[in-house]
Regions:
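Structured mid-to-C-terminal alpha-helical surface segments
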Residues: 1-43, 52-61, 65, 69-241
Length: 241
């Protein structure tokens, strides 16, 4: 892999900015390495990379890489071992951790952030890897194909199910509203071809917490009834976007 050539191709053929092309190349490298490594079945793809794959849009606005560990510990030593496994594949591209592994703690997410250096020996690109622990190890994950620049057939990886993605996204939308084009496209596709709403409902664990000022609803999140589909349309219609 030639990182500079991959970036130039995204700039030339897809119209990416240098910043977005660099981020996309790093994502392609990490996804490819993950698919080729022994860690493939212990990691699920989530976040913006997954949203773009599900919505069919390019990853122009997605800068970081979000992954969840499943049946794998979230210690510093384990994270370093994971990155080392991605680096030592003999494909001419190395991945190393730069600086300290950071703690991430937000309203509905806890995890670790790893700053990475991706190098082919000629060029070195920076990216960020956000790691979490999969909330339900017993829940079956989907297999999904991701487009990568240097592989015509793409790579197949485990990813959060459509129900899981929607449950997490619905929580976020109720708090913050729709903020990105991939989110909008995903919601539109969901309404055209919805997953199992009973499964989505079972994944919602809001405990009666009040929504934010944006997207005001009466009562706590736990009162929401997503069956039938018309109820969900009503919920979405009340989100302030």
């Amino acid at each position: 892999m030639d990182l500079n050539e991959m970036r130039a191709r995204y700039e030339r053929e897809e119209g990416y900015s240098c910043l977005n092309a660099t981020a996309r190349v790093c994502q392609d490298v990490i996804l490819s390495k993950l698919a080729a490594s022994g860690m493939r079945d212990r990691v699920t793809v989530k976040g913006g990379v997954l949203m773009c794959a599900l919505s069919g849009s390019g990853r122009r606005a997605t800068q970081d890489i979000d992954l969840d560990f499943a049946r794998y510990p979230m210690t510093d030593a384990s994270i370093r071992s994971f990155v080392s496994a991605l680096s030592n594949l003999g494909d001419g591209v190395t991945v190393r951790i730069a600086g300290e592994i950071e703690e991430l703690s937000q309203q509905d997410y806890k995890g670790r952030r790893v700053n990475l250096k991706v190098s082919d020996g000629r060029s070195t690109f920076d990216t960020k890897l956000d790691l979490g622990v999969h909330a339900s190890a017993a829940m079956e994950q989907d297999e999904l194909w991701f487009d990568v620049a240097h592989r015509q057939e793409g790579v197949c990886l485990l990813a959060n199910s459509k129900e899981q993605v929607f449950a997490e996204k619905l929580k976020s939308l109720l708090r913050h509203g729709i903020r990105t084009a991939p989110e909008t496209r995903f919601m539109e596709r969901f309404m055209e071809n919805p997953p199992n709403l009973a499964t989505v409902q079972s994944l919602l664990d809001w405990g009666g917490r009040e929504p934010s000022r944006q997207g005001q609803l009466t009562g706590g999140y736990s009162c929401l009834d997503l069956e039938p589909l018309e109820n969900l349309r009503g919920v979405l219609s009340q989100i302030d976007i």
